[in-house]
Structure formats: C-alpha cells, structure tokens
C-alpha cells in the first residue's frame, strides 16, 4: 500500500500541448485560443490523482498564470480541482518579503474550524480581514497619503504591515534572498504572534 507524492512542473505545459494537438486536429478553439476540450482534459487528469483504500496520493503542482490573470481559462480550470493553492506575489517580492506568498489569494479547503481548531481559524480570519482592509486603503494612501486616513485606519495599516513582515519570518528556503539564517517557528508560536499583533499589543514596536 504505497503512498505517492508526485510533483508536476508546469501544468500549463500540459494545457499548451493539448491546445497544439487540438489545433492539428482542426478543432475550433475556445476562449483565448485554448482547446474546446480543456475542462474535460483537465478533469480527466486531475481525477486520476486520488487516494484509495490501497494507498494515498498527494500532488504538488506548479501552475503558471499567464499575464498574472487568475481568470485565464488554464489556471481557472486547474484551481477548481485543487484542495489548496499557494499564490506567489510579485508585489511582495518587490518589497523584499520572502517567501512572497499572498495570503489573500491563497486558499485551502482545510482552513475550517473543525479541522485546524477554533483558535487557529479565528486568528487566520482576523489576519485576512486586516490585510484586506489594508489592500482597500492602498489607493487612498497612494493618492492622498497616509496622513489623510482616520486614526483607526492608520492603526490597521501599521498592523497589516507588521503582519506582512511577520509572514516573512526567516525560512530556510529564503536564506539566499534575505541573507538571514533560517529559523523554525512552531505553529502555536506563529498563532500567538498574530494574536499579539491584531489587537495592537505590539503597536509600540517598529515594522521591522
């Protein structure tokens, strides 16, 4: 009863190959030039990756997003079959934040209170709400400046920036980018850190 962990890099190549074969067969292309059978082909390949009573199979797949457009048929069709997605952000990378994972666009079907626990779930929701509000305020900040925000919004921005930095806590895989040695931080410690940032217990500390 083997347990299998396949890595797929890159799933867009599978889609492009199907598109080329479809064109050679003379089929009429669908949206953005993809093959009309894209949904069927993707479903057929993804449904083969399933656990049975004889063993489990978990796949890690790299999905290139053309023009950073998540509504493109290729990534959109793929994401419908995934249990979790980790989305990398060019904006975070430009800020020097690594790993440049966007917590707002990333998803997981496991993020449920009966799976991860009530404390973990509520903390994660609080983090996402704070980051979402910060995202909504960025246009106002760019046009009018931070000083034009209300006191409450300025606190939200400061805490959101702390959260961004906290999410970049020194990981071993990011050593080459940050120059900081990797450090393991346990899940309970991470949750506790967020629980201190969200209510403002660390407002007196700088972002860094």
UniProtKB/Swiss-Prot annotation:
Superkingdom: Eukaryota
GO terms for biological process, alphabetical: proton motive force-driven mitochondrial ATP synthesis
Protein location: Plastid, Chloroplast thylakoid membrane
GO molecular function: ATP binding; proton-transporting ATP synthase activity, rotational mechanism
Database matches in SUPFAM superfamilies: C-terminal domain of alpha and beta subunits of F1 ATP synthase, P-loop containing nucleoside triphosphate hydrolases
Pfam family, any one: ATP-synt_VA_C
Membrane disposition: Peripheral membrane protein
EC code: 7.1.2.2
Function: Produces ATP from ADP in the presence of a proton gradient across the membrane. The catalytic sites are hosted primarily by the beta subunits.
Assembly behavior: F-type ATPases have 2 components, CF(1) - the catalytic core - and CF(0) - the membrane proton channel. CF(1) has five subunits: alpha(3), beta(3), gamma(1), delta(1), epsilon(1). CF(0) has four main subunits: a(1), b(1), b'(1) and c(9-12).
Stored PANTHER family: ATP SYNTHASE, ATP SYNTHASE SUBUNIT BETA, MITOCHONDRIAL
Similarity field: Belongs to the ATPase alpha/beta chains family.
Protein's UniProt name: ATP synthase subunit beta, chloroplastic
């Amino acid at each position: 009863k083997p347990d299998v962990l396949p890595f797929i890099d890159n799933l867009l190549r599978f889609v492009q190959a199907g598109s080329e074969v479809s064109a050679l067969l003379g089929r009429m292309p669908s949206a953005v030039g993809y093959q009309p059978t894209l949904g069927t082909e993707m479903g057929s390949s993804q449904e083969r990756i399933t656990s049975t009573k004889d063993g489990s199979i978990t796949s890690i797949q790299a999905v290139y997003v053309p023009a950073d457009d998540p509504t493109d048929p290729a990534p959109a069709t793929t994401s419908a079959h995934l249990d979790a997605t980790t989305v990398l952000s060019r904006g975070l990378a430009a800020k020097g934040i690594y790993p440049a994972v966007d917590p707002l666009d990333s998803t997981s079907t496991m993020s449920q209170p009966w799976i991860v626990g009530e404390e973990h779930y509520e903390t994660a929701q609080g983090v996402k709400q704070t980051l979402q509000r910060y995202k909504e305020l960025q246009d106002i900040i760019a046009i009018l400046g931070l000083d034009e925000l209300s006191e409450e919004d300025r606190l939200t921005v400061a805490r959101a920036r702390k959260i961004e930095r906290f999410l970049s806590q020194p990981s071993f895989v990011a050593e080459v980018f940050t120059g900081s040695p990797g450090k393991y931080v346990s899940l309970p410690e991470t949750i506790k850190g967020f629980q201190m940032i969200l209510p403002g217990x660390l407002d007196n500390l700088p972002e860094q």
